[in-house]
Amino acid sequence: MKDNWMKYKDDSLVASFYDSQTTTFQEQGFETELAFGTAGIRGQFGLGPGRLNRYTIQRLALGIANYLKDKEDNPSIVIHYDIRHLSSEFAHIITQILTSKGIKVYLADVYKTTPQLSFAVRYLQTSAGIMITASHNPKDYNGIKVYGADGAQLDEDTSLEVAQYINNLGNPLELNIDLNQELIEKNTFDLQEAVYDSYINEITNLIGDIPQSDLKVVYTSLHGTGVPIIPDVLKHLNFQNVSLVELQCELDPNFSSVKSANPEEREAFDLAIQQAHDLEANLIIATDPDVDRMGFVERDTNGQTYYFGGSEIGALLIKYLLEYTNVPNHSVVIQSIVSGELGKRLAQQHEVTVKEVLIGFKHIAKAIRELDDTESFLFAYEESYGYLADDFVRDKDAIQIVPLIIKYTSILKNEGKTLHDALKEIHREVGQYRDKPMSKVFEGREGQQQINALMDKLRRNIPDVIAGLKVIAVEDYETLKRNYKEDNTEEAISLPQANVIRILFKEGFIALRPSGTEPKLKFYLSLNVDNFEQVSQDIYNYIFGDTE
């Protein structure tokens, strides 16, 4: 196989990446195959069916084209791409193949964000959408995310069907690619300015007026697509007291100034915080490269900083919506099953229904789609820094949330309060819930076997008490059963299957799941206990004690 691929190296678009890789890494590209799942495909550049290159992208595009042509008489699609290496090139390859098959393509003429893609699909009423991005992954990654007509990522069944169309094509080097220049020109359309304007209008209508205050904000796009759209939104809202971290607001597919362009990582804020100290700014905001996720840090008058966790941000946004907006009757908050107790209990305290879904925003989008006529969408979030305050987009949308948190902070500042003060108010109202995502890596060939064995062991035997906390129930999302410890009764869980175990206590929950991309077991805690750090460590020791 390798010899055959080497003949195509010069035209693969990835020769320079391949040449810089270790022999072991190069070989792995020929031994694996990119798998299309609910998040599309994501991978590293290189040669072979297991890497991103011209030929694996052509295969993907042809599979999607065949799927769309079989499903509709006149299919159409929107294609956006971010600033990563080869994003633009992949977008044009996909466009040429789809248009040559008679599919109408709205192609962005410049980099765009993921939320804009979701909005554009809905606004233009296309059959599907494609976003070329790898979100916050390292620089040598890229990916193709596929969206349905509702602007949400594909569900499980549709993803499996599209994957079958792709797999039916066989070897990426032996495809019948028939590009038709006449059809390419006929079926390729520029994105109208009206799409952008309508999206901005939706956000300004959502936010309303940002009150005048002496709030100072520092913003970093972490080298991604947040500029110019975030400053443009703030300009439309007449908020001017924002300072950009110029170095990090330069487009850079290498993300040169950060170890990880991920607002979950504290290190990503270092430059912005230094600028905030220099300017005596109050709020430091970062978005990830495709601007679907965001995080923020608050700086007090003494120069002390507080990093807000993903679930804390979700709870703060719920508090803002409850206190400063007109909340309709039968409002609904949607969150993932690992997104913490704080926001959930706050919403429930105010008679807002909370619906919990599996991890992944596609499940949130499905829950939005399934709301009945009596229910009103209020807010959705995941603990991994993804939020949605209005459903004109059906994926997480940091472009909505940045001005929303600025507005909330401005209101609080005029009241002599901070976001940290608001968080303390939530704690006083519903309890001192704290959240902590943890994980353990299992290296080597045996890693996955160890993870499976650990999950099996937990499924077979969970004690009545863990780290001094009485177990109320155990939820197994593989068997879709909830077992109550006290009377040993069971009830069904009405969610799709997933390899997740959640253990419920009066004080909160812990949850475990294997990572889908790494040899890692992820571990979530959300607990209201006095000695949180000690209890967290005791639970960790119980779960992983035999593997240390």
UniProtKB/Swiss-Prot annotation:
Please give the CDD domains that the UniProt record associates with this protein.
Answer: PGM2 (cd05799)
Pathway(s) this gene product operates in, as recorded in its UniProt entry: Glycolipid metabolism; diglucosyl-diacylglycerol biosynthesis
State if Ubl conjugation is listed as a keyword: no
State the Pfam families in the record: PGM_PMM_I (PF02878), PGM_PMM_II (PF02879), PGM_PMM_III (PF02880), PGM_PMM_IV (PF00408)
Q: Which residues form the active site?
A: 135 (phosphoserine intermediate)
Enzyme Commission no: 5.4.2.2
Cysteine pairs bridged by disulfides in the record: none
Residues annotated as signal peptide: none
Gene3D superfamilies in UniProt: Alpha-D-Glucose-1,6-Bisphosphate, subunit A, domain 3 (3.40.120.10), Alpha-D-phosphohexomutase, C-terminal domain (3.30.310.50)
PROSITE patterns xrefs: PGM_PMM
Which molecular-function annotation in GO is an example for this chain?
A: phosphopentomutase activity
What does the entry comment about cofactor binding?
A: Binds 1 Mg(2+) ion per subunit.
InterPro entries, sorted: A-D-PHexomutase_a/b/a-I, A-D-PHexomutase_a/b/a-I/II/III, A-D-PHexomutase_a/b/a-II, A-D-PHexomutase_a/b/a-III, A-D-PHexomutase_C, A-D-PHexomutase_C_sf, A-D-PHexomutase_CS, Alpha-D-phosphohexomutase_SF
Q: Which GO terms describe its biological process?
A: enterobacterial common antigen biosynthetic process; glucose metabolic process; purine ribonucleoside salvage
Catalytic reaction list: alpha-D-glucose 1-phosphate = alpha-D-glucose 6-phosphate
Q: Which UniProt keywords apply?
A: Carbohydrate metabolism, Glucose metabolism, Isomerase, Magnesium, Metal-binding, Phosphoprotein
Which cofactors are named for this entry?
Mg(2+)
- The entry marks the following residues as binding Mg(2+), namely 135, 288, 290, 292
Q: What class of enzyme is it?
A: isomerase
Role played? Catalyzes the interconversion between glucose-6-phosphate and alpha-glucose-1-phosphate. This is the first step in the biosynthesis of diglucosyl-diacylglycerol (Glc2-DAG), i.e. a glycolipid found in the membrane, which is also used as a membrane anchor for lipoteichoic acid (LTA).
Q: So what family is this one in? A: Belongs to the phosphohexose mutase family.
Report the protein name in the record: Phosphoglucomutase
